Amino acid sequence: MIKLRLKRFGKKREASYRIVAAVSTSRRDGRPLEELGFYNPRTDEVRLDEEGIIRRLQQGAQPTDTVRSILTKQKIFEKINA
């Protein structure tokens, strides 16, 4: 199963995350199938590849709870249903 989840990177105690599509059994920081965005919790900066995320969701990818929350705030699910 394909999951949309966060991949951690950055310095110790200054984490940032990439939103990636990955096989659910792979490691958190393992090689993803595709990088779809960026999230920095310290500054609340979010950059998304909206077309790529919508494509993956339509193919059946399941977002984790945290990624689902980020996508909801960015109104991605509204764009799918429109």
UniProtKB/Swiss-Prot annotation:
<keyword id="KW-0687">Ribonucleoprotein</keyword>
<dbReference type="GO" id="GO:0006412">
    <property type="term" value="P:translation"/>
</dbReference>
<protein>
    <recommendedName>
        <fullName>Small ribosomal subunit protein bS16</fullName>
    </recommendedName>
</protein>
<dbReference type="GO" id="GO:0005737">
    <property type="term" value="C:cytoplasm"/>
</dbReference>
<dbReference type="InterPro" id="IPR000307">
    <property type="entry name" value="Ribosomal_bS16"/>
</dbReference>
<dbReference type="InterPro" id="IPR020592">
    <property type="entry name" value="Ribosomal_bS16_CS"/>
</dbReference>
<keyword id="KW-0689">Ribosomal protein</keyword>
<dbReference type="GO" id="GO:0015935">
    <property type="term" value="C:small ribosomal subunit"/>
</dbReference>
<dbReference type="GO" id="GO:0003735">
    <property type="term" value="F:structural constituent of ribosome"/>
</dbReference>
<dbReference type="InterPro" id="IPR023803">
    <property type="entry name" value="Ribosomal_bS16_dom_sf"/>
</dbReference>
<comment type="similarity">
    <text>Belongs to the bacterial ribosomal protein bS16 family.</text>
</comment>
<dbReference type="Pfam" id="PF00886">
    <property type="entry name" value="Ribosomal_S16"/>
</dbReference>
